Amino acid sequence: MCNGGLVAYWNMDRTVAFGDEKAVIESVNNRRDVIHGHFKIVDGVSGKGIKFDGFTTRVICKASDAPHFKGAFTVEAWIAPQAYPWNWCAIINQEENHEKGYFFGIDELGHVGLHLSLDDEWIQCTTKKRVPFMTKWSHIAATFDEEEGITVYIDGMEEASLSCSGNLCFAENTDLQIGRNLTLLPPAALVRPHVSFPASYSFDGIIDEVKIYDRKLSAKEVMESYLRSKPKIMRPPLKWRKLPKLPHTGKFGAFYTKLKFYEEWDELWRVGDHPDVVVNFEEPFHMVFWRGTNFNMNLVTENGRWVGDQSAEGGGGEVIGCCEHMSDKQCRYAHVRIIENNDARVVVHWRYALCDVLYNISSKDPVTGWGNWADEYYTIYPDGVAVRHFIIHGRDPGYSITEPTVINQPGERAEDNIFLEAVTIANLEGDIRTYSWENWPGPGGVGEGFYNPVSNPTLCMLNLKSRYKPFYIYEPGTRIIPYGGGVLELRREYSHFPTWNHWPVSQIPSDGRYALAPDRVSSSAILSPMPPMRRNERGDLEGRFIMGLSNKKIEDLIPLNRFWLNSPELEILKGNFVKESFSRDEHAYIIRRENGENGALEFTLDASEDSPAVNPAFVIKGWGYGGAKMRINGETLKPSGNFRFGHRRSVNPRDLVVWIRGEFIEPVKISLIPVEMT
C-alpha cells in the first residue's frame, strides 16, 4: 500500500447536495468541494467517475482547505479524454499566472506534464508519450522533490524526468481546481498567431481517483498504485460523437427544428425549440441550416457525409483576423428563416454579419454604425438543385464567398469522406478533368490555381464517398482553384487536405486552428471558387451560383448547366400574361399576369441541345388562389412527382410556382389552366 502521506482524495463516486449546489467528497478530510458547470456521473475505474463537459465543469477546493506543502509532493489520477484539450488543461492545478504554485495536466496532443514554480521560475516537465483519447483509461502521476526534481508517469511507467532543485513557490492563497485551468490559455496550433485570445474550456472526458500526497512516491509505489487500481475493462464508457441525425420523411419540404449534437454541447445553447432548418427530399439526402455551422447550408448525403461552405468574408476596421460567419461562434448575428415552403420549391433566407471572433463587425461606418452584413436566399427545388443568391451589404472592394468544405466527424479525416481524386471540373463544351490531392494539384501558392486547368469552367463536383455527390454550377468568369490558402495551411503528416477544428461547432475564440488529431469535428476546405459579383443599384455586391446533390455523372449535369446559363426563349401564345425574364437567382422563368382575368396561360420553350430546359420552374405573378392543370404538347399531367405547384404568398393575389421534372431538347408547348381549389 502507498497511502502514507495521502492528504487529499477525490474518488468521484457521487455528488452530494451542498446548499443550492452540488459537491464531491474529498474523503481524507471528509470535506465537500463544490462542482460547477455541467457534468455527468458515469462508470469509472473504481465505482463511478465524473464526465467533464469540456466547457464549464470544474471542482473547486478552497485555498484554505487545499493541501499546503513547501517541499515534496505527488499527484495522480485516472483519466479518459473524449477529446484532447485546445492547449494545456489541468487535471489538478493550484497556481497563479504561472508564477506561483503547480499545474498537472495534459496538452493538446495528450502529453502529460507537471509544471511548477521553483525559486520564482516556472519549470515544466512533459512526456513524449501521449495518452490516447476515446479508447483507453490512462493512469497519470507526477512527483516532485526539492532536491531531485520532477518525474512524470503514464500507466505506472516513468515517461519524463527533469533534474532540478530549489524551493517550491506555493500559491497558498489560490483555490485548487480540478479539470479546468486557473490561468486561461489561447488555443495551440493557431493558423494566425496574432489572433490569439485566452480560451475558456474544461477537461473533456472522465476523471476518476484523484489523489495528492505530501511526499514523493517512489517509482515502485507509483506502479503499485497503477496496478492496484487498474480496471478490468480498460475501455472507458465513451461514445463517438456524431453530427445530428436527420429525420427523413421521403417528402419534399422544409421544417424548423432543434437538431441535437451531443448533450454537453447542446446544454450551452440559449435557444428555443426551432433554431435550425432542415430540407427533406424524396431522395435520401438533406440540405441543413444548423447553428453548429452558423447556419450556412450543408449538403448531407444519403450516408451522412456533410459538406459545408464559406460565407461572405472580408472587411477591415477595428477587427482582428477573419470576419465571416465562422467567427460568430454563438450565432449572435446569424439566423435563418423559411420564406417559401410548398410542393414546388423551398426558399430559405440566411442573414449574418461579417464579424471577428470577438463579435466586432467589420468596416463599421463611423456615422451610422452599420458594418458588413449579408443576406442570402437559397431557392431549393425537389430534384436537389438549389440556387445560392447572395447580397453583401458592404462597400469594401472585394469579398470571398465560397469554399466547399468537407466536414469530418470525430474519428475521421477528410480521406474517410472524399476520394483523393477529389474534384471533377467541366465546362459547357463538355471538357472534363479530375484532379487528385495525392500531391497538391497546383503550384500550391496562396491563390494559385490547378495544373492543366479546364478553360472557362462552370461546373464542378466533389467526389465524396457516397452515391449522391455535391455539385456546383457557376456563371462564366468564375475562377475555380484548390483551397486558396494553398500548401501554406497543409499539414501533410495529418491529411492530404488542409484541415482545421476551430469550426464547425467549436466555441473557442479562434479563426483558424489546425487539427492535430481526429478527436473533434473538423473541416477540410477543398476549393476556393471565385464567382463574379456585381454592384446593384444600392451599391451592394450581388451574385449567385447553383449547389446541389445528384447521383448523376458530371457529364450528365452539363445540360442543367446549359439551361441555367443559356435558358431557352419563352414565348407567350395565349393569355393576358407577359414574360419578365429567366431569373438565375430563382432558377425560374418569371411570368406576370397583366390583369385580373382568371384565364389560361399557354407558352412555348424554344429548347434545343445547346439551350435545353432541365426540370424547369415558372413563377406566375398574380395567378391568384386557384391551382392549375397542366398540358405539355397537348398531354395532360396531373400533379405528381413530375408536376408540382404551390403558391407564394404576397400582398397582391398569390403567385403560382410550377416545377416540372423533365429534360427538353426540342421546342415544347406548355399550357396552364386555372383550377378552383377547395
Please give the residue ranges for each predicted region.
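Extracellular glycan-associated modules
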Residues: 1-236
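Secretory/extracellular carbohydrate-interaction modules
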Residues: 80-88, 268-272, 330-339
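Beta-strand-rich N-terminal accessory domains
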Residues: 236-313, 458-487
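Beta-strand-rich recognition/accessory modules
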Residues: 251-252, 260-264, 453-574, 651-675
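Extended, loop-rich substrate-binding clefts of extracytoplasmic carbohydrate-active enzymes
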Residues: 318-389
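Acidic (Asp/Glu-rich), glycine- and aromatic
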Residues: 365, 385-427
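Surface-exposed beta-strand/loop patches in extracellular or lumenal glycoproteins
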Residues: 402-407, 459-466, 473-477, 484, ...
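C-terminal beta-sandwich/jelly-roll accessory domains of carbohydrate-active enzymes
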Residues: 555-678
